[in-house]
Swiss-Prot record:
E.C. designation(s): 2.7.7.-, 2.7.7.108
Name assigned to this protein: Protein nucleotidyltransferase YdiU
Task performed by this protein: Nucleotidyltransferase involved in the post-translational modification of proteins. It can catalyze the addition of adenosine monophosphate (AMP) or uridine monophosphate (UMP) to a protein, resulting in modifications known as AMPylation and UMPylation.
Catalytic activity: L-seryl-[protein] + ATP = 3-O-(5'-adenylyl)-L-seryl-[protein] + diphosphate; L-threonyl-[protein] + ATP = 3-O-(5'-adenylyl)-L-threonyl-[protein] + diphosphate; L-tyrosyl-[protein] + ATP = O-(5'-adenylyl)-L-tyrosyl-[protein] + diphosphate; L-histidyl-[protein] + UTP = N(tele)-(5'-uridylyl)-L-histidyl-[protein] + diphosphate
Annotated catalytic residues: D249 (proton acceptor)
Required cofactor(s): Mg(2+); Mn(2+)
PANTHER family in alphabetical order: PROTEIN ADENYLYLTRANSFERASE SELO, MITOCHONDRIAL
C-alpha cells in the first residue's frame, strides 16, 4: 500500500531565482495530532497510509515522498505598508500533487526548518498556532470561503522558544498555489522583465487559462485577480472575519485566504475591530479590509507595469483604468451577499440604506454580528428598543414586495447566515486543552460542529453563544 502521492512540480520549472531547493530539517520524534480524512479523500490519498509511521514521517519532513522536489519560495511584500524582501522562512513546498480529477495543489510543510529566507528565525512552529490554522482554515472552507486547507498537524518531539518553551509542530498546508502578490513584487523589483513574464505566464496557465487567448493576457490577469480578491474580501466581511495581517505577501493570485496567524472573528459589530497585537494603528481593522485589498491590488498592478505596455505612461494608464473599478466591484459582491443574508433575491434602490441602518443599529446597541443575522433567520427578533422594532417592520415590508414565499425567504437566509462561527473563546479553549493537557477531544468536538455551519443543528446551540463580557480585549498573535 502507498499514500497515492502524485507529484508533478511545475513551479520548480520556473527560473531558479524564484526559489531555493532545500530539504526539510528532520525532527526527533514526530507524532500525528490530527489528520483531515475528508480532505485526504478529496485529494485521492490513502488516509490509512497517511496516518501510519511512514505517512507521519512525510508530514514531519523526515521522509520525502517519491516525485517531490522540496523548495522554499522567494517573494517580497509590503508588511504594514513597508516593503521588504521576504520568502518562505519556515515553510518548504514539497511539490504539487495532482489529484485523480486532475486538480493541481501545492503540498507545503509549515514549520519544517530554516531556509535561506529565515532572516534569523528558527524555521519552526509551535503547536498552538498550527492547530489554530487547522481549525480556522477548515471552518472557513465549511463557510464556503476560498481558503488554503490543512491536511495534518504533527508534533515534532522538540520544543520551540517563543515567550516560553512550547511544543514544536508542523502543519501540512494544501493550496491551489502559493503564488502571491508578493511573488510578483519580488520579480518586478529584483528580477528581469523576462523572469517577470515567465511568472505571469505561469500564473495565467495555472489559474486563469482563458487568459492565454485574451488580447492582452497581462491585463486579463490583473482583472481576474482583482475580481477574485474583491469577491473574497466581501465574503470575509459577510461573516465578520478579520484577517489581521493583510500584507501583500498574504494575498494570493488564486483568490484563496492564506495565513491564519492573528486572524479572528468579530463578536460585537464594530468596523474598528482589531485583534492583532501587532496592528497597533488599526491598519487591518475589519472596516479597513476592503480598502487594503484595493491597495494591495494596486501594488500588484505596479509589478505588472512592464508587461502591460512598452511605454510606461500607457502602462500606468491601463493599470489605473483596471484598479479604479475595485471599489464598485467589491460593493457589488458585498451588496449581493448582504441581500442574501436578509433574504432579498430582488434588487431595490433602497436596499443599501436598509442594510446600512441595520449595521448602524448593531453598532449603537452593541449587538453580536453573527447572532443578529441568526435571530432574523430563526424569527427570534425579540428586541424591546423601538428603533430595532421599527427596522424589523421595514425589513418585513421589503421582503413582502418580492415574489417569494416566507418559507423561501427564510431558507435563503439559512443558506447564507451561519448558525455558528469559530468563536475566539471556543478556539482558545480547544487549543488550551490540546497544547497544555494533551486533550484533543475539545478540538474534535469544535471541528465537528464547525463542519456544517449552515445546518442549524441542536448541538451547535452551545457553540453559538457569545463570550462573557470581559474588561480585557481579545488579542491574537502572529505565532512566528
Amino acid at each position: 500500500m502507498n499514500a497515492n502521492w502524485n507529484f508533478d512540480n511545475s513551479y520548480a520549472r520556473l527560473p531558479e531565482r524564484f526559489f531555493t531547493r532545500i530539504y526539510p530539517t528532520p525532527v526527533s520524534d514526530p507524532k500525528l495530532v490530527v489528520l483531515n480524512h475528508s480532505l485526504a479523500k478529496e485529494l485521492g490519498l490513502n488516509a490509512e497510509v497517511l496516518a501510519s509511521e511512514e505517512g507521519v514521517a512525510v508530514f514531519a519532513g523526515n521522509r520525502v515522498p517519491e516525485g517531490a522536489e522540496p523548495l522554499a519560495q522567494a517573494y517580497a511584500g509590503h508588511q504594514f505598508g513597508y516593503f521588504n524582501m521576504l520568502g518562505d522562512g519556515r515553510a518548504i513546498l514539497l511539490g504539487e500533487h495532482v489529484t485523480p480529477s486532475g486538480e493541481r495543489v501545492d503540498i507545503q510543510l509549515k514549520g519544517s526548518g530554516r531556509t535561506p529566507y529565515s532572516r534569523g528565525g528558527d524555521g519552526r512552529a509551535a503547536l498552538g498556532p498550527m492547530l489554530r490554522e487547522y481549525i480556522i482554515s477548515e471552518a472557513m472552507h465549511a463557510l464556503g470561503i476560498p481558503t488554503t486547507r490543512s491536511l495534518a498537524v504533527v508534533t515534532t518531539g522538540e520544543v520551540v522558544m517563543r515567550e516560553t518553551e512550547l511544543p514544536g509542530a508542523i502543519l501540512t498546508r494544501v493550496a491551489a498555489s502559493h503564488l502571491r502578490v508578493g511573488t510578483f513584487q519580488y520579480a518586478g523589483r529584483f528580477l528581469s522583465k523576462e523572469e517577470l513574464q515567465a511568472l505571469a505566464d505561469y500564473a495565467i496557465k495555472r489559474h486563469y487559462p482563458n487568459g492565454e487567448h485574451a488580447s492582452n493576457r497581462y491585463v486579463f490577469l490583473l482583472e481576474e485577480v482583482m475580481k477574485k480578491q474583491a469577491a473574497l474580501v466581501a465574503k470575509w466581511q459577510l461573516v465578520g472575519f478579520i484577517h489581521g495581517v493583510m500584507n501583500t505577501d498574504n494575498m494570493t493570485i488564486s483568490g484563496e485566504t492564506i495565513d491564519y496567524g492573528p486572524c479572528a472573528f468579530m463578536d460585537v459589530y464594530d468596523p474598528e475591530t482589531v485583534f492583532s497585537s501587532i496592528d497597533t494603528q488599526g491598519r487591518y481593522a475589519y472596516g479597513n479590509q476592503p480598502y487594503i485589498a484595493g491597495w494591495n491590488i494596486a501594488r500588484f498592478a505596479e509589478s505588472l507595469l512592464p508587461l502591460l505596455h512598452d511605454e510606461e505612461e500607457k502602462a500606468i494608464e491601463i493599470a489605473q483604468k483596471v484598479i479604479e473599478q475595485f471599489p464598485a466591484l467589491y460593493e457589488t459582491y458585498w451588496l449581493q451577499g448582504m441581500r442574501a443574508k436578509l433574504g432579498l433575491w430582488t434588487e431595490e434602490a433602497e436596499d443599501k440604506k436598509l442594510i446600512g441602518e441595520l449595521l448602524h443599529l448593531m453598532y449603537t446597541h452593541r449587538l453580536d454580528y453573527t447572532n443578529t443575522f441568526r435571530s432574523l433567520t430563526l424569527e427570534e427578533w425579540h428586541f424591546c428598543e423601538q428603533e430595532l422594532r421599527d427596522w424589523y417592520t421595514r425589513w418585513q415590508q421589503r421582503i413582502a414586495r418580492q415574489d417569494m414565499t416566507k418559507e423561501e425567504v427564510y431558507e435563503c437566509m439559512r443558506q447564507n447566515n451561519p448558525a455558528i462561527i469559530p468563536r475566539n473563546y471556543r478556539v482558545e479553549e480547544a487549543l488550551a486543552a490540546a497544547v497544555e493537557h494533551g486533550d484533543d477531544t475539545v478540538m474534535e468536538r469544535l471541528l465537528h460542529v464547525l463542519s456544517d455551519p449552515y445546518a442549524y443543528m441542536e448541538e451547535q446551540e452551545e457553540y453559538a453563544k457569545t463570550p462573557e463580557p470581559s474588561d480585557r480585549p481579545y488579542r491574537t498573535f502572529c505565532g512566528t
